[in-house]
Amino acid sequence: MADFDVIAMGAGHNSLTTCGYLAKAGKKVLLLERHDYAGGGAATQQILTPGYHHDLHSSVHIMIQANPLITNDELDLFKKYGMDYKYSDVPHATIFADQSALMTYKDLDKTCEGMAKISQRDADAYRRFVELGQSMLPMVMPGMYKPQPPLGALMAMLDSSEEGRVMMDMMQRSSMDIINTWFTHDKIKMHIARAVSENLQLPDELGTGMGTVMFTALMHTYGVAQPWGGSGKLSESMVRAIEATGGEIRYNSEIKRILVSGGKAKGVELTTGEKIMARDAVIGSMHPHKIRQFVDGVSEPVLKRAENASLAAFSLFVSHYDLREPVQFRTAEKDVEKAIMLTLCQHESMADMQRDFDALKRGELTDLMFSAGNDESKTDPTRVPKGAGMWHSTGFAPFNLLEGGSSRWDDIREAYGEERQKQQGKFVSNLNSDNIIAHKFYTPLDLERNSPNSMVEGDVHGVAPYFYQSVGHRPTPDLGQFKVPGIDSLYLVGPSMPPAGGVVGAGRAAAMGMFEDLGMDFDSTFQTGESKSKNTVKARTQAPDDGAVRLFDENDAELMTVDSIDTQDDELVVRGKTFGTMPLTARLGPGDLRRAAKMALSPAKFMTIVKMLFSKD
């Protein structure tokens, strides 16, 4: 007999998100985690000296800022379970080799003032670029945290308007195409290209251009944040929410396989041999390359397409340091200390940077290393003992080395990490033996070992962010709706799934799909709540009184504005805009109108409509 409604493989932040929604709706959930901590890619641990709290993977929370999980506090993480974000006025900064610095402030005017000191032309272009991206956000963001449409259907919709075709164009271009079109100065180009490449995408990779537009727009609209106490505090608040609603998390519990019978997922078997059954569903936090390992009965074409999902061209080398005192930057620009994302740029030109990106693709270790990092205790003293400091650095590196393959990382880990430390010393004056208490290096191979079922070949975002692996085709068209064809009641979550890797809260979309399949009403279960997020928006209450008809989604975000309803021949023609800016014309013929009337005009619905006509907004 099943003891749980839903069983989840893994307790990463995506599994926690999905199970949090299910648990709040009354489902009894069990999460089985192979580690002795929850969070997966959003985890904070004392890995070296007691009192120093390091983020194991993700550190910066960007895409999740617009998620109703946060903006509407749908799981009461802020209200009840201790979640709290710190926002910085400086989402991103770059220190260059000459110790000059360029800041992306959340304030667009202030950002442009700084850029104007380098290039007035580029500062003006940057303002227009951000405004273009912000005009697209209403088209993109409302659907980001729901099940995604098929790629072909989205393209057909975009191709129906001029604004949509602009988006299509950017989606298919490379970041470098877009950066070169808009900007001229190498420092500004490198500043933007380096920030966008944190998504593990090469600047000249076709099909990644839209990320460049969205990334800059998001920083100036929603900002960039870190949880107080570390990235893992998000996961810890989710654990408390699940346990408070009757859910259970078991640690040091590794799943061997998903139990399938009659084409339906029934439960799981642990590596200990224990079997646990689920009444309603099983959630698998697994990479598409790993489905064959865990699930029997999946058709060979589906498996082969899953195993052909493309990975990022490079991975990360991560360094953690416990310091006696906070880091001291060599640059005179003090605002870099506020930056949540801080790039240390050794390259003198965009051409030099591009050559080293090309080398990464070939599996080469570059002489000038890509580095980013910061002392997170400068803005969050809870991360370290009083008066101490820390250094958390990431840098791009290939998983499969041209010389020696991935296994060579075990041989060169310390030497490579020490060279990275030496190069970072060009920017930080006290990253040395006098100040370092302890350190730990994670190679791309170590990242895979830490999360073998999600971060294959060290791809911390699951799969590459390419155009053909976007929206409902991420990671493949078969799997883009969080389901595995031919296996009922099995749902997939994790960084490989839509809309993107990183801390997005993508498990919300998976939960919406599960609610529908289980006959549950997601919309009525999760109403808008109060939140400590700075990004809470209620579109309905802010809509102008301009005579237009507006349609809103379940989170009170505007979906469509109807500007006019006319007749043409024997059709009703509805004109307006979707998501605030995209023109839309819809035509209803006689048959469509009869069917609509039949849907709307039952006696009960008719009386409701009459009452609505005489009610106040």
Model regions and ranges:
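Rossmann-like flavin
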Residues: 97-206
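N-terminal glycine-rich phosphate/pyrophosphate-binding loop and immediately adjacent elements
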Residues: 2-138
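Flavin-binding catalytic cores
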Residues: 326-327, 361-366, 409-449
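Active-site-proximal substrate-binding core of FAD-dependent oxidoreductases
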Residues: 260, 516-540
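A conserved FAD-binding loop/helix module that cradles the flavin
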Residues: 495-515
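Helical element adjacent to the flavin cofactor pocket in flavoenzyme catalytic cores
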Residues: 216-265
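A glycine-rich dinucleotide-binding beta-alpha-beta segment and adjacent secondary-structure elements
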Residues: 185-202, 366-374, 430-498
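Mid-domain catalytic core of redox enzymes
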Residues: 256-383
